[in-house]
């Protein structure tokens, strides 16, 4: 993973952003980044009662005090749209080179022009969409790379297509065998 700037991840709810961020943390750890240099905060945690930039700074200060990161820490802020003013805090942290930051959220504020202006030149955008049908098949352990792969598997592919159309294309649905009522 390369981190030239902060990273903004925006995609719909249940599309796997928390999972992807945790994979990023794991990958950094595998690449030799010390665990004390990795901080993951989920702002939907009910233990956070007042969500503002003061809380973000308190979290960062407590993290530094107790884990003593060396070098530049990586901070992952999940569902950051819950915190009023978070974008100014991220900009300040980036400008002061205090951390490399990944933010994720699932509302329109993360996509706003105002936010793009506020973080211009300071971030990269990563947008993840729900699964394509081919990805959905792969999640269900079926690989279809050519028309020959379909031969003799039409019934199973049709069953999965029905599931894809009826249930949606989010990873959680693809991995579930449960049928849900709407």
Task: List each model region and its residues.
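Short hydrophobic/aromatic beta-strand immediately N-terminal to the Walker A/P-loop
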Residues: 6-10
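Walker A (P-loop) phosphate-binding loop of P-loop NTPases
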Residues: 13-14
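Conserved lysine of the Walker
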Residues: 17
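Hydrophobic positions on the alpha1 helix immediately C-terminal to the Walker A/P-loop
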Residues: 20
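Short glycine-rich substrate-engagement loop in P-loop NTPases that contacts/grips substrate
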Residues: 39-71
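Short regulatory helix/loop adjacent to the ATP-binding pocket of P-loop NTPases
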Residues: 92, 109-125, 137-142
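Structural recognition of the conserved hydrophobic beta-strand(s) that form the central parallel beta-sheet
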Residues: 100-106, 127, 136
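Interdomain hinge/linker elements that couple catalytic modules in large macromolecular machines
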Residues: 134, 138-182
């Amino acid at each position: 993973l390369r981190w030239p700037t902060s990273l903004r991840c925006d995609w719909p709810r249940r599309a796997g952003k928390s999972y992807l961020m945790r994979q990023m943390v794991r990958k950094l750890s595998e690449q030799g980044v010390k665990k004390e240099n990795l901080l993951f905060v989920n702002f939907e945690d009910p233990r956070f009662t007042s969500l503002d930039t003061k809380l973000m700074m308190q979290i960062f200060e407590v993290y530094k005090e107790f884990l003593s990161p060396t070098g530049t820490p990586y901070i992952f802020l999940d569902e950051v749209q819950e915190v009023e003013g978070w974008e100014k805090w991220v900009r300040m942290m980036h400008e002061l080179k205090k951390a490399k930051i990944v933010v994720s959220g699932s509302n329109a504020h993360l996509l706003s022009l105002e936010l793009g202006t506020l973080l211009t030149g300071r971030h990269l955008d990563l947008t993840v969409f729900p699964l394509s049908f081919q990805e959905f098949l792969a999640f269900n352990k079926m690989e279809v790379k050519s028309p020959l792969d379909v031969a003799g598997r039409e019934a199973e592919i049709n069953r999965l297509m029905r599931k894809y159309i009826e249930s949606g294309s989010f990873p959680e649905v693809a991995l579930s065998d449960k049928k849900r009522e709407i």
